[in-house]
Every structure is written in C-alpha cells, then in structure tokens.
C-alpha cells in the first residue's frame, strides 16, 4: 500500500511539474510590434509593405500548418487568375434597360494594376525573383453561345471600350477566328451554333503560393522578423494599454507562449472570423460566415495542355450565382502547364481545407445566428444551386466540361478538391442579414487589431486590400510625407485613377509588363461589331453571389 501511495504521489508531483512548466512557458511573453496571424498572401503582403514603411518595427508571423502558403494561397487551391475583369462577365451586370454597367469591372481592373505595380517593385528590389515562377502571360477570353448571350457580349464589349483599362480587347463571332484563339473550345462544335468571344492578350495566370513563399523568405532575412510554424492561436486578450496578448500553442510539443503585440493582423483565411470573434471587439458581432468549397477537373495530358493557351470564362446559367461561371484555364503550377475546368461547388462545415468539421458550429453565436437564418430564407435559389452542385455525378461534371471542350475524353481528366471560401454574412438593419461578395477589412476603433474577411476577388487584389488596411488602421502615418513617398515608390499610381487616362494606363502597363516579363503590345483600334440590341430585362429576383 505504501508503494502504491508513493507511486501516486510521485506521479502527482510529476504532472504538477509538467503543468507548472507549461504555465511558465506560456507566461514567457515575447514582445513584437506587429503580429501577423496566418502564413498566406495577405499577411505576406502586409508584412512586405510594413518592412519598407517602418524597417525598424519587429514582426512575428504565426502559421498553424507546417509551411506557409499551404491553404487558400496554394496554387492548387485557387483558380490562379489575375482578376482584372477582362473576361469575368459577373463584373459587368446588365441593367434593367439592357445597358451594361462597367463600374465594378473598372474597380477590379484598377485594383489589379496596383497588384502588378506592387509585384514589379518587389522584383526591382530583389524581394521577388524570377517572375516566370509566379506570373505568366495567358490571354483572357469570354466565350458565350446563344442569341441572348451573344447580344450581351456585344453590349459588354462596346461598353468596355469607353475605359482606357480595356483597350486592346478583341471581339469576334467568327468560328474560324475563335478557333484560332482557343482551338480546344471550338473543335467539334456545331458550325451553325451562334457564338461570340472576346480576347485580351495581356491576361495573366498567377501562382499566389509562390509569391507568398518568396515574400516571406525575404522577410525572414531580417533579424527583427520571426516565423513560427505549427503554431495555433488559442486566445486573444486586449491589455490596458491597448496592446494585445495572444496565446499561441506549439502543435508539435503542446507548449504555449504569450506574444504581446502593439498591432495584430488576422489574415488567417477561413479561420479569420473565429479569431476575430475570439478578440471580443464589438465590431465582430456584425459578422457570420458560410463555407463553400470548390472542385476542378484537371488535365495534365500534353495533347490537351499544348492545345490550349487561354483562360476562357463563360456566362453563369440562369438561377446560378454570377460568380459561379465555369471556365477552362491554362495554369502554370509546379513549373509545368496544366488545364483546369470548373469550379463545381462543394459543401463542408470546415472553414479551411485543413480545418475542423466544427468550424461552422463554433462560429455561430447568439449575435449572428439570426442574420444567418435571414440569409438562408432570403436566398432559397442559392440554397437550391448549392444542393444541385453537391449532387452532381461524375457524368454531370463531364457533360459540363463538354460544353466548353466538345471533344473532351474522360480518361484525360481527374477531379481535384480546391480550397474553402468562407462567404461573409453581415447584419443588416432592413433585411436582418445579407450575403456580401468581396473582402472586408474589419478593425477596432483604436486601430490595434484588424481582420480580413471574405473570399473574392481575394489574392489577386492583396496589394490594394492591404493598402486599404494601412489607410484604415494607420491613417495618421499614411498621411505623413515619409509614408506617402514610400507608398508612391511602391505603387506609382497610388492616389490616382488610371481609368480615363490613356497615357498613364499605357505607361503603367508597359512598366509592369517589362519588369514582370509579360507580353504587352500597344492597343490597336477596336474591332467593329454588330450593334447590340439592348432589350429591357425581365424583373427577376437577384441571385446572391458567392465566391468559389
């Protein structure tokens, strides 16, 4: 009995010692000026801005996986498009009178020009190397069929010619011309089918994972930057001086440490909402999230890959979210060309591809459950669409592919599960809750913590989104002469609009193309097209948009 008692006492002492050691470890505070949560392109971009603006600031980046850029920024987990509205028809909605609205397209294109300038500047500084490893010229095309859709594309093309950002776009309804642009799309197609296409040579395919890895590798060269992998944030607590104490667990050895930061950025993709809620700031109460995944069909067969050099976007079918538009894309991944077709929507309660099935449930609170219910009730068409997508069979997906590639063979394609996209649901005074497409920077009033929510257009606009964050949380510094000069060196067009200024547009496109090794020819005269017949549009309930 004495032996048993002694053994139990010994175990208790041992366990207590382990517990005390863990507490001691957690109590050892690391201090940093900026804490970046998440090792994706958003954190990498913000860190790169701050490194130039305030080189003496210390920065710590924590990432729960074993490497950076392994979630949504990973090249295989997104479409890899340099979104600039050259081909994405959802950015040019049709008004009730049949005319085309281009405001959203212009804004998206302006944003991507900022990203191009940011990347070009980093190449010139030696931060980014070998541009072909992360960005390549791939023409962007819109392709439609049927009388109404052809008429829509005519009207869209005519409307976009009013903007300096879309000069150089080509238009054709000729089968032979379109076949020259995208042979894979036209071969085997009914020669009597009415089709139309636009093509812009300066489109791009971007590997956001590679950009992320290179940006972070450059940050790591400085002694006042620390990267902690396999590290998960477990708690955030505001201190009396408005700094933050963030508890971070080491997923490999189970220990924990506290990091005291003057500013915290939550760039954790799908996990950002839960961490924002954990912070306890009142601004977080307005938000909820709904996860949607995406799948692509992938071909690596040289007979397919070498026969297609374009990103070809179609038009979303009636009743489907505008952003769900199918596309067949040339991609450059892991140093080789592949072709992807999709996306097909999938559903999982995970907020991250490497997340937990409890993510959706654990993010649902008393303050956001009603907005979520209102969104579900108000968007039954969207619910129907998601259910229909989840129910798709292998044959259904292949038939969808054949609409864009009539001579496709099943054996050339495999299914790939891409990343999760958490859609923003925001409290609304009139509707209770609304589904918000796009990204949103949410910060506290003091400007000590900020999170990025949302999924589209995402990585392609990381540079302007983080610029917006700087203006929101570091407003006084942004207006200072020092920061203004640095920001204009990073983004030459900062503070100006390129749209409407032909000379400035061409100057920036030529500069970024030269530095990034991209194709750019001075735009020629616009193609002549049949005059679009603008028909008043029937009144229909708008389908909420989502990002896939």
Curated annotation (Swiss-Prot):
Instruction: Give the main EC class.
Output: oxidoreductase
Q: Which SUPFAM superfamilies match?
A: FAD/NAD(P)-binding domain
Coiled-coil region(s) at which residues? none
Q: Which domain of life is it from?
A: Bacteria
According to the record, the residues making up region (Disordered) are 521-548
Composition bias of kind Low complexity appears in 530-541
InterPro entries in UniProt:
FAD/NAD-bd_sf, MQO
Which cofactors does the annotated protein need, by name? FAD
- Under the GO molecular function aspect, what terms does this record hold? 2-hydroxyglutarate dehydrogenase activity; L-malate dehydrogenase (quinone) activity
Q: Which keywords has UniProt assigned to this entry? A: FAD, Flavoprotein, Oxidoreductase, Tricarboxylic acid cycle
- EC number(s) recorded for this UniProt protein: 1.1.5.4
Reaction catalyzed: (S)-malate + a quinone = a quinol + oxaloacetate
| Metabolic or biological pathway, per its Swiss-Prot or TrEMBL entry | Carbohydrate metabolism; tricarboxylic acid cycle; oxaloacetate from (S)-malate (quinone route): step 1/1
Task: List this protein's GO terms for biological process.
Answer: tricarboxylic acid cycle
HAMAP family, per database record: MQO
Describe the family membership recorded for this protein in Swiss-Prot or TrEMBL.
Belongs to the MQO family.
In its UniProt entry, what is this protein called? Probable malate:quinone oxidoreductase
This protein's species is Escherichia coli O81 (strain ED1a)
